[in-house]
Regions:
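Extracytoplasmic metal-acquisition and chelation regions
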Residues: 1-154
Length: 154
């Protein structure tokens, strides 16, 4: 019975995520990161991931030509924010932000598993809301809270 309850919450979470992503204007359904982190989610929910350091650098070195290509790619992506791995952002991510004119997101999604001190559902809903709100969508916090409570009750 516990497993069935967990499955129901996870199915509800999947539907909720799709609804939140749908509030983001289609051109802005892109997550600009340093490294490939959200590939699975991007494919499942129909947004693009632009891992700029993975796509444009070799060995982590940011050359002037790479910075120019990254800036152009970000500008044309439609993204309203760059999502660094952590805050404060690295010097490289700050340079990319300045060069592209696209700001660093004020909040950072947790890209590696479950956030410390948070449940799986709290991590997922927080990450989705950070992305959706930064990209011009509207996140349904009330339903996110209900999902978190349902998960905690299992």
């Amino acid at each position: 019975q516990r497993r069935a309850k967990a499955d129901r919450v996870l199915v509800s979470l999947g539907g909720w995520i799709g609804q939140q992503i749908a509030t983001v204007p289609e051109k802005q359904r892109v997550v600009v990161t340093g490294h490939r982190t959200y590939d699975f989610m991007a494919k499942r929910y129909g947004f693009r991931e632009l891992p700029v350091l993975d796509d444009y650098t070799t060995g982590g070195t940011l050359r002037p030509s790479s910075l120019s290509a990254i800036s152009k790619s970000i500008k044309t992506s439609g993204s309203k924010a760059i999502f660094p791995e952590s805050l404060p952002p690295s010097k490289t991510m700050r340079r990319i932000s300045r060069s592209s004119g696209v700001p660093i997101a004020k909040q950072v999604p947790f890209g590696d598993g479950q956030a410390p001190g948070k449940s799986l559902i709290q991590t997922a809903t927080s990450n989705v809301c950070i992305f959706v709100n930064a990209q011009g969508g509207r996140c349904d916090q009330e339903t996110a809270s209900q999902l978190q409570k349902r998960w905690a009750a299992i």
